């Protein structure tokens, strides 16, 4: 429900935080730009977006000829994204329970999650990412853009700096801890609190 209420003003909220270079969305445009450039290296990629929101990133990929599949738990977000991408295959579903059935029938060049997986616990994140690997094509990649920290200490420093604006309901990625399950992951930092993770 909260994301339905937030849907109309979501892009605006993100923009303000990014321009001011403040948590949580500092580096947001850099993150999306980096992911966009990575995916555009492949021609007509098949992309699954987990928690696509209003379709900010996927609409750009859609315009460039990518086949777009997606799952989001907000019907309002799906309605907004469908306006931008009428031929995309978008499904409603809670990804804390995994992928919805129709999306399990396909294989993807890229599975993308931007600012969505921090709603899962660390254990849920690892389980979900391990499961998502089963839906990649050969040489496919999972790309995550989110609030990410190299170490637990970096996270604590950001939390201190953010003060009252810190969201205690969100559980952010810590690279050194995620490497236990995904030793080959690559991490590119985009701001004090944002980065891109790539898993093969």
Where are the predicted features?
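Short catalytic micro-motifs in class I SAM-dependent methyltransferases
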Residues: 115-116
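Class I (Rossmann-like) S-adenosyl-L-methionine-dependent methyltransferase catalytic domain
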Residues: 1-39, 54-102, 143-200
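Conserved class I S-adenosyl-L-methionine
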Residues: 44-51
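A short glycine-rich, Lys/Arg-flanked "PGG" loop and its adjoining helix->strand segment in the class I
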Residues: 126-138
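A conserved beta-strand element that flanks and buttresses the S-adenosyl-L-methionine
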Residues: 112
